[in-house]
Amino acid sequence: MESLTLQPIQKVSGEVNLPGSKSVSNRALLLAALSTGTTRLTNLLDSDDIRHMLNALTQLGVDYQLSADKTVCEVTGVGGAFSSDKALELFLGNAGTAMRPLAAALCLGRGEYVLTGEPRMKERPIGHLVTALREAGADVEYLENENYPPLKITGTGLKSGTVSIDGSISSQFLTAFLMAAPLAEGEVTIKIEGELVSKPYIDITLHIMKQFGVDVINNDYQEFVIPTGQSYTAPGDFLVEGDASSASYFLAAAAIKGGEIKVTGIGKNSIQGDIQFADALEKMGAEIEWGDDYVISRCGELKGIDMDYNHIPDAAMTIATTALFAKGTTAIRNVYNWRVKETDRLAAMATELRKVGAEVEEGEDYIIVNPVAELTHAAIDTYDDHRMAMCFSLVALSDTPVTINDPGCTSKTFPDYFDKLKMLSL
């Protein structure tokens, strides 16, 4: 296995333009494909997850032109639901942002589809979405294990009426149903069971649906109504915001080490909840400055904080390694859904933090980190999880090197992450 050893970084400073947001890129690609007209997406993320979505759209007969650097994509929409005369198998890697929304969208038209992916994808639950789709008349079957991909979908359309979705495990199930709902037979009402996790990701979905011409009535995140008679219309130009989760590593680096880092491509009016990471960092003692399309982080003396991160679970991972440099205890609470991400992130984070010497308590839905005076040089296993690799790169901001196993796993969302980090390291 390939590994990368990062030597201690003395100082960080500079500016980094963020790659496009994964969450925004894949939502916008799908809605552009379902639209009438042509959408020109700029600052599209070039990564594995986006590639899986683009490959699937190609198989589904969608025309698009991709620029040489793969960050500009012109999509000609099919003007409604996908249909296919031949049976198709779509391989979606480990891309939840492709698997879940496509599972819902493919129920709308005609055709027979198998949705599959990497071994880890077959361990990531999808049962709450499938239950809701079946409630709306969809024909979906599990090909291996109940409640998990791979799925076989026979397009039959989605009925109007009321469905219930359990929101307690992943907001992607609701996102998937919301994006398919305007193309159902009539008005759709979605009722939420349990506590809806990651609400800011639903805000992203609703915002992008509106940009493509569809209005959703949001009754306090308990019920969503998609009125009948709507369809997706290409907005023409669509700018993909920089990825807020990717910003977290650089903002944390400046807060930990001093110097000043400016991230561009995202700002105070971002539609991504993960930008609230900067608020958490500020609570820890960092100095944060906001602009319309940038955020600046400067050094503060960091202290541990105890916080609920249910609203920003992805960015919260960066807090776990930032905690190694804070005075006192840091508690990250209400993040059960870390367990159903690219890996079981609670178990993985606890294991790897202990390797570098931290005292860690891992609970069912929380992690508590106590730093140590001197970190230990360790080889960090990344579990084929891009965020594990990027989070643990921050260990190099100590006086101790860190070795990252399988650094290439960052290709899921940020292929040139380590190059960007090197550019900012003095």
UniProtKB/Swiss-Prot annotation:
Pathway: Metabolic intermediate biosynthesis; chorismate biosynthesis; chorismate from D-erythrose 4-phosphate and phosphoenolpyruvate: step 6/7. 3-phosphoshikimate binds at K22, S23, R27, S170, S171, Q172, S198, D314, N337, K341. Its EC number is 2.5.1.19. InterPro entries: Enolpyruvate_Tfrase_dom, Enolpyruvate_Tfrase_sf, EPSP_synthase, EPSP_synthase_CS, RNA3'P_cycl/enolpyr_Trfase_a/b. SUPFAM superfamilies: EPT/RTPC-like (SSF55205). Monomer. Catalyzes the transfer of the enolpyruvyl moiety of phosphoenolpyruvate (PEP) to the 5-hydroxyl of shikimate-3-phosphate (S3P) to produce enolpyruvyl shikimate-3-phosphate and inorganic phosphate. This is 3-phosphoshikimate 1-carboxyvinyltransferase. It comes from Vibrio atlanticus (strain LGP32).
